[in-house]
């Protein structure tokens, strides 16, 4: 189970995705923890069993136990936050924005890894889940911490490719079962 296995599973009509897997993940300039934490968090967020099954072992091999757990935590807490804050943002009644959230999200304050890495993973998950409010918030925290736009873009490129591969392979699995 690996990036190479996943690339091999991508159908010919989606050759661009196969090439992007190789360039965006296989040849990334991100430090290993940022790269593989982003890969794991976005694989979880993609909701694709195939993608998660193929990428998780390689991510686990490249992350410390703390980073592995933190990347999963980023995917979990952002699954909740992205729905909550996206809904609050999209409602035409802006009074919801003044109400207390009342949701526990302690892991954001104490993720067990470098907070910049956790923010990057949270940002990438937010890209998949489409929460503009969360994207802006995490991007601002990253920029204030000195993270350059190129690094931030790498995270959402990973998110885009992982999501697209998940959609494609899950569709192929359904079509093959017919």
Swiss-Prot record:
Question: What is the name of this protein?
Answer: Alkyl hydroperoxide reductase AhpD
Give the reaction(s) catalysed.
N(6)-[(R)-dihydrolipoyl]-L-lysyl-[lipoyl-carrier protein] + a hydroperoxide = N(6)-[(R)-lipoyl]-L-lysyl-[lipoyl-carrier protein] + an alcohol + H2O
Source organism per entry reads: Streptomyces coelicolor (strain ATCC BAA-471 / A3(2) / M145)
Active site: which residues? 131, 134
Q: Which residues form a coiled coil?
A: none
From the record, give the cysteines joined by S-S bonds: 131-134
Oligomeric state and partners?
Homotrimer.
The molecular function terms of the Gene Ontology recorded here are:
alkyl hydroperoxide reductase activity; disulfide oxidoreductase activity; hydroperoxide reductase activity; peroxiredoxin activity
Question: Which key words tag this protein in UniProt?
Answer: Antioxidant, Disulfide bond, Oxidoreductase, Peroxidase, Redox-active center
GO terms for biological process?
Answer: cell redox homeostasis; response to oxidative stress
Superkingdom field: Bacteria
Briefly, what is this protein's role? Answer: Antioxidant protein with alkyl hydroperoxidase activity. Required for the reduction of the AhpC active site cysteine residues and for the regeneration of the AhpC enzyme activity.
Q: Which family does it belong to?
A: Belongs to the AhpD family.
Tell me which EC number(s) this protein carries: 1.11.1.28
**UniProt cross-references to Gene3D superfamilies, sorted A to Z:** AhpD-like
EC class name: oxidoreductase
């Amino acid at each position: 189970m690996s990036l190479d296995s996943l690339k091999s599973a991508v159908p010919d009509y989606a050759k661009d995705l196969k090439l992007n897997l190789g360039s965006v993940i296989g040849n990334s300039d991100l430090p290993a923890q940022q790269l593989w934490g982003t890969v794991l968090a976005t694989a979880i967020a993609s909701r694709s069993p195939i993608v998660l099954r193929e990428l998780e072992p390689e991510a686990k091999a490249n992350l410390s136990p703390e980073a592995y757990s933190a990347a999963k935590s980023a995917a979990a807490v952002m699954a909740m936050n992205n729905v909550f804050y996206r809904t609050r943002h999209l409602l035409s009644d802006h009074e919801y924005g003044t109400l207390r959230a009342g949701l526990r999200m302690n892991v954001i304050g104490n993720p067990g890894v470098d907070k910049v890495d956790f923010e990057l993973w949270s940002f990438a998950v937010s890209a998949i889940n489409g929460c503009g409010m969360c994207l802006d918030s995490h991007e601002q925290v990253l920029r204030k911490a000195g993270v350059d736009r190129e690094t931030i873009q790498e995270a959402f490129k990973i998110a885009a490719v992982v999501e697209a591969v998940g959609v494609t392979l899950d569709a192929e699995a359904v079509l093959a079962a017919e």
